[in-house]
């Protein structure tokens, strides 16, 4: 993913001075949670690029603006309590997860979005920074079928100031997510 021409229209920043980038190899000077994400990518042999954004990326909209990509190329990681099991749901930034569909996909009676304290406790990441890797207490990961299957996607990378860019095929492979319909219909 180091070929700039390959990414020209898929999420390159409009203001290169606003962010700092490095591949998942190299200098270790980022927060522990970001290093944990980087190590998970390395262990999986994934080609991913972690970037730091000075102003942070607290929402999907802010992330898309910082990265310079379409909102649909941002992947939100949402934690659900499904009858006592923790399930991470991945949906594109321009969609919302449908709790009824999550419950159905997990054969649960009810799926409830986790609160901020639960997200931190279960994932080890803060809300807005959840990476879909290095998740010891998550039993399943569901990937919405409407997430783009080609090109670069951007995910949380362990802190509100960090995002990881990787190919859509890498996201599915690295997370071992189940491809299902979990987004609200529009």
Outline where the language-model segments fall.
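Extended, low-hydrophobicity, polar/charged segments
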Residues: 2-186
